[in-house]
Amino acid sequence: MGANVYSLLKVFVIPSAVSTVSANTTSPSTASSTASTSTGKVTKTDTTYKDDNMEIEITTGKTSDTTYYVADIKLSSADYLKTALAQNTYGTNITDTTSSIAQQNNAIFAINGDYYGANQSGYVIKNGQVYRDTDRNSDYEDLAVYSDGSFKTFKESDTTAQKLVDSGVVNTFAFGPTLVENGKVAVSENEEVGQAMADNPRTAIGVIEESDGSVHYIVIVSDGRTSESSGLTLYEMAELMKSYGVTTAYNLDGGGSSTMYFNGQVINKPTTNGNKISERAVSDIVYIGY
């Protein structure tokens, strides 16, 4: 095998583990304050979940040509918003479906993350641990999630991964762009990620700042690339997020990766190029759980 061919396979195909973590990992700084299970009554349906620490409601919406799914998530503590790695391993070309990773971590709700494994650079901080501190040199900002549940976008060139952790950041996402900032749409009507099509399956997460200090998130996943649902533009997703009152919203990996999982089921219809309804394997997820 030629050296160039092997190099390409190593980057894009051959799995290579760097670090393994246990499932359901909690940041050491928050472990003592986080309940490991619900201690009260659990009430759930196909579209709702409620216990003494969290309340989740899933609704379905439709534009003229696209179906989307909205998760309204209220938590008693930001500790219940977590991330997980495929096969609980950080490395290259290590993937699994969103639903499989969610099940392995006992997630109540989950979405695909930023697919860190598709890139060789870009900060990777998951549950308070730095896995990668290489600047991705992108025009887009990253999203930082702090231990109190608040969101803040930042440029990697302006800081280091360790400084972020030292300031209270527990998770970062290196995809983008920022959709809503300070309650205002932050993308133009024609903006797109790279050479992607304008209408796409999308995954986005936003935060609503509540006056009582509670943690409130909005997550939206749209179907796309099918005759039944064409998909959303970044601007359309940003407008949707704004309509729910978020102060900050961020675009995560989309296309065939876009998946919403809830109460043991995949809620949306993940698809790749409209060929078949199936989940794409990804490197990481965002989830709600104990």
Task: Cite the ranges covered by each PLM segment.
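Conserved hydrophobic/aromatic beta-strand scaffold that supports enzyme active sites
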Residues: 68-72, 178, 204, 285
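Active-site-adjacent helix-turn-beta-strand microarchitecture at beta-sheet edges
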Residues: 116-198
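A short, polar/proline- and glycine-enriched secondary-structure boundary/capping micro-motif
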Residues: 92-94, 162-168, 198, 228-233
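Conserved, well-ordered active-site substructure
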Residues: 120-137, 190-211, 216-247, 257-290
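Structural recognition of the beta-strand scaffold that forms the well-ordered cores
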Residues: 108-112, 142-145, 152, 206, ...
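Short, solvent-exposed aromatic-acidic interface loops
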Residues: 86-90, 157-161, 221-226
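Short, glycine-/Ser/Thr-/acidic-enriched flexible segments
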Residues: 63, 76-78, 116, 158, ...
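Zymogen propeptides
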Residues: 1-136, 141-142, 152-153
